[in-house]
């Protein structure tokens, strides 16, 4: 028999890429439509949406050759982020600091993804923030705001993530919630959306990426907020409304504890692996530390990841 429809938003980027093939086979796509998924993935369409929503993004351009890439990079000023469009796990994404880097990176990218445009963006120094939200076409539910501890540009699967975000001003949080609402409405999201932001200074908020699907942070944010995001999104996809399901739309109140997600790596098992972190994902697992304070949650997360930290107290008389 023919399926009533397919849900592509729970299978990561791989499932999103099957959307077109499924539609050609006559399978209806449930949840966010294929056309709106495209708007989030296609650079030019997405730029139009950001403009409509009045949301800033790092300046950049779309190129096809190394020459064009160098032109854009020199116009923006180094460092820049270079990446192929439509990628999974940040594959082929690099931070370039000069023209030589660009020649090298474009050579590598063209080996893995021909005929795809390449994005060159200004690399912003700032805090990387991530949000997963559920939208029913009218209302948006944001379980919480997560903050990555490392510099921006480390792949989100490899970064240490903290909920609730520790260093954001109320104004920045309000902007993040408002931008999430605008984007979800503008992309006509039915189900899940994942958005990554960079916050520079006190409260300059830029959008760096939107995924109209479930992301790897969904299990983490569900666990630490107690909101069952996947069952909720599944019900929304088949037509239920957030309010009917007993939830208050908007950014939910922050928990009174701290949860730290820690990536787990297998470098000791993989000989010759490059252990420096960047925009390409290298972790093979993750674990979670929950406590009343950030320090203790971080300590528990390190223990969970198998990293033994030295225990000592610093006394005043120890200092020279």
Predicted feature descriptions by range:
Residues 32-93:
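A conserved helix-loop-beta module that forms one wall/lid of the active-site cleft
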Residues 10, 38, 64, 97, ...:
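Small/polar loops that bind or transfer phosphate-bearing groups
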Residues 1-3, 13-16, 27, 31, ...:
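ATP-dependent carboxylate activation and anion-phosphoryl transfer catalytic cores
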Residues 1-41, 56-61:
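A short, GP-enriched loop/loop-strand-helix hinge that lies immediately N-terminal to
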Residues 8, 83, 194:
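Short beta-strand segments at enzyme active-site cores
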